[in-house]
Amino acid sequence: MKRLTLLLAMMTATAISINAEELESQESNQKTTIEVPAWVKNIKFSGYGMLQYQGTDQEGAKSNTFNLRLARFILDGKIGDFDWRAQIQGTNAKGPGEPTVQLVDLYAEWRKYPEFKIRAGQFKRAFTYENPTHPITQGWRGYADVINNLSGFGDRTGEKSSGGRDIGVQLSGDLFPNADGRRLFHYQVGIYNGEGINSKDKDNKKDIIGGIWVMPIKGLRIGAFGWTGTRGEMSSTYHYLEEYFDANNDKKTRLKNQSLTVQSARKNRYAFSAEYSKDEYMFRTEYLHSQGWGSNLNFGDKADGWYVFGIVPVIKSKLHAKARYQCYRQDKSWNRHELIDSDGKSYVYGGAKTSYEVGLNYFFTKNLEMHLEYARINDRSLAKHNYNMVDVELDFRF
């Protein structure tokens, strides 16, 4: 955690210094006032933390643990018509005792005109509604499984966890204002390396990702997204049955596996999305489809998934109730598959994972909230499909 502590100290020191509107120095009993430039005064320091308890009774993988889900520290600023952001993250994503610190956002965006904005650097990919949603605002124990696997988090291709981000350039804008000034159409399109955060392009080919949506009434948006590109080097595995003849000349099979690196692994994906968000009511659903091989070649070259959820106020600004249904099919099939050789050794793969979730979100203040959640999970890749999960989170912003 030394790296995280050092980075936090540096950012805190910067924030303290930039919030001073004047610097005064006394020399020879004379006081000199130095005006701080406007771009320096515009810099803001913020962040948030997510503390988690999670328990599950999954057979063979029971757990009951506290966890530091996420910590982020952010500098935002403005220089003329440009906004910029730098964000670092600390997380235990690798597991207890293995904290990681990494740069997740570093970009500048020209925002002079709402119809045409240009962003360059490292930032969220222009794919799906859920991807760019703040993890606390999102309101659940985690992003939907299909988002994690097909939107650049812990991607199907084996890409390192990138929080849905990549390095590139994006154009976006909002068009066609109505009589009230509310704009009815949004577009966004970006060109990216295709390798995730803090990584150069490994095959000199780029990912192109874009989306559009319409906003016919206040709070409602309906959209579609597309993604085509490659991952430069994809480490893959493949299990298969090899035939042979034994000493009695009887045909037998034995289970084998092979590791290989796929060059320029294709990613062709699309998504359909709908969302209504107004007066603390939030409803959202998305369907995602992927064509292209993943890091496990036994899964085939297709995957898909969807989710739908609702969050409604029980006590306005104080207590919300929520429910979510989600499904991810890692090989676009419902049931798992099994390879069994002549000696009875087997390899199981594929199948759908479905979750039914309910919970409550309680707001102590605007910047402090608790999330409670119960999930019933059906994972058909497991011998015992059904298990339960309980998740409690304390989330804060500053």
Regions found by a protein language model. Give the residues of each.
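N-terminal periplasmic/intermembrane-space "pro-region" immediately following the signal or transit peptide
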Residues: 1-50
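Interfacial loop-to-helix transition and helix-capping segments at the boundaries
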Residues: 199-205, 265-267
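Charge-dense, low-complexity intrinsically disordered segments
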Residues: 158, 199, 261
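Active-site-proximal beta-alpha loop/turn segments in soluble metabolic enzymes
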Residues: 190-198, 234-236, 240
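Outer-membrane beta-barrel pore domains
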Residues: 23, 58-60, 107, 111, ...
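Short, electropositive, low-hydrophobicity segments enriched in small/polar residues
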Residues: 51, 125, 198, 227, ...
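Outer membrane beta-barrel
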Residues: 32-194, 202-209, 213-222, 309-313, ...
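Hydrophobic alpha-helical membrane context
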Residues: 14-15, 82, 336
